[in-house]
Amino acid sequence: MSRMVDTMGDLLTARRHFDRAMTIKNGQGCVAALPEFVAATEADPSMADAWLGRIACGDRDLASLKQLNAHSEWLHRETTRIGRTLAAEVQLGPSIGITVTDASQVGLALSSALTIAGEYAKADALLANRELLDSWRNYQWHQLARAFLMYVTQRWPDVLSTAAEDLPPQAIVMPAVTASICALAAHAAAHLGQGRVALDWLDRVDVIGHSRSSERFGADVLTAAIGPADIPLLVADLAYVRGMVYRQLHEEDKAQIWLSKATINGVLTDAAKEALADPNLRLIVTDERTIASRSDRWDASTAKSRDQLDDDNAAQRRGELLAEGRELLAKQVGLAAVKQAVSALEDQLEVRMMRLEHGLPVEGQTNHMLLVGPPGTGKTTTAEALGKIYAGMGIVRHPEIREVRRSDFCGHYIGESGPKTNELIEKSLGRIIFMDEFYSLIERHQDGTPDMIGMEAVNQLLVQLETHRFDFCFIGAGYEDQVDEFLTVNPGLAGRFNRKLRFESYSPVEIVEIGHRYATPRASQLDDAAREVFLDAVTTIRNYTTPSGQHGIDAMQNGRFARNVIERAEGFRDTRVVAQKRAGQPVSVQDLQIITATDIDAAIRSVCSDNRDMAAIVW
């Protein structure tokens, strides 16, 4: 009985304060009325109308809005009692406010306040409550509240999907809300690097007296027209994001114009001022994969870096990459010693990783290696296979090799090559760099001494190869004698490579086999006589020594020679087949494919005639 009396007394006290607050609000204004509304809620914390009064009179405390939401079932009890109405304007989204009178509107306003306060999960849970959609006016407000949550948490794809949702036909559409949603969607598209999509969203909003871009849309697309002074913050934001989108699209003149329009009462917004001061300033662009990688869906800082995502992708593909690398190497004609060496290298790398895991030393080991031998013997293809094998074993992140040359290391003047080499290596961490004719990194003066620009690159490369023994893989290739000579330009250079794979010249049988394998997917076939002529000719070439002392097959670049011969032979075949057709003779499918002995002989002589070192060969 005593508790009931106390409760009744609290209610009566609260009502006296509430009634006084409403009277004062009408006569003296909100500032004077606020203390009475506060006193009412202190007397009866469940008095929802008093909480609404506090908020209407300027109480912006999140706790007050939470209390109003908690007791919103009691809304209108006191205002109905005294025959009055009460409403509060509460921010919803970045730049406009919702007029709160009912419980569902309180929930929508609270979701926005929770978003601003960083209580994202609570905002999300509140927006999942379908009771917020108890009136047709609330549907578009709900769409804005959800888009705003996704905007603040930088879940850009979700902003776009929310903004693109169709409203029910009965939903009440408000220009200010439509414009706000379009602005958020434009930001989202821009942050995803979709500049043209962003402009599409921006064009849906007309600023009266300034633009009429919305006329290009059909009736099925929601558009809006707002006055330049109606919502200054929103108008400024629309100009700002349009300017940043034009900058993203490399249209700087337009960017400057629109950024200059991002003003409130004639004063540039801070964001626009910063962007105008620095033409290199751009919106941060990300992608759906990065956003989806977050460990906390609401926290952008928990997303994985591009390297981490690449690592994850590589980890998923490692088995495939390892198999692809092995298959690529196995398909190469010959190279028995190289294949055996790569197999042994795999074993060494696997043991090295196990030793590192257990803290055991791996002194003298490195990823870097040399591939030496004549041109056309499969060095580049082997490097490609190693890229897949290394990635499959987790030694590097990226299976693709990056082919480089002297110009990637060397500048035009002394002092430029060191920094350029450092930059190249830093960008190549986690990758494989492949440089054919490795020795071309330096150029020799007439007296045989290396040039200073090249030596600067060599000396810096030496440091990087040691510093990053396991962070990337550098593969140098070329003739063995020239590679060995090059390694002497710096005493420490040879020690940076602990493995050398030797590639031998192809045998005549292997050259013919390479030609056959090259022809097959091109729907070309060598008949038996053509293969015999090919073999005899390659044997002659192999036994020939050029004036410079080079084996003929090396001068003709081994496997490349086989491919060149097939291509040239196809040309002779085509000429022969056309003559056959013009003579009135039928041409079969087989005729279109077969390369004859005559074709191959003419092709070999033609290819060899392109090389002056082969001029003295006797067929």
UniProtKB/Swiss-Prot annotation:
Gene3D superfamilies with a match to the protein in the record: 1.10.8.60, P-loop containing nucleotide triphosphate hydrolases, Tetratricopeptide repeat domain
* Keyword terms of this UniProt record: ATP-binding, Cytoplasm, Nucleotide-binding
> Cellular component terms, GO, for this chain's entry?
cytoplasm
Q: Under the GO molecular function aspect, what terms does this record hold?
A: ATP binding; ATP hydrolysis activity
Q: Which SMART domains match?
A: AAA
Family annotation (InterPro entries): AAA+_ATPase, AAA_lid_6, ATPase_AAA_core, CbxX/CfxQ, CbxX/CfxQ_RuBisCO_ESX, P-loop_NTPase, T7SS_EccA, T7SS_EccA1-like_N
Report the principal subcellular site.
cytoplasm
> So what does this one do?
Shows ATPase activity. Could provide energy for export of ESX-2 substrates.
Q: Which NCBIfam families match?
A: T7SS_EccA
Similarity comment text for this entry: Belongs to the CbxX/CfxQ family.
Q: What is this protein called?
A: ESX-2 secretion system protein EccA2
Q: What organism does this protein naturally occur in?
A: Mycobacterium tuberculosis (strain ATCC 25618 / H37Rv)
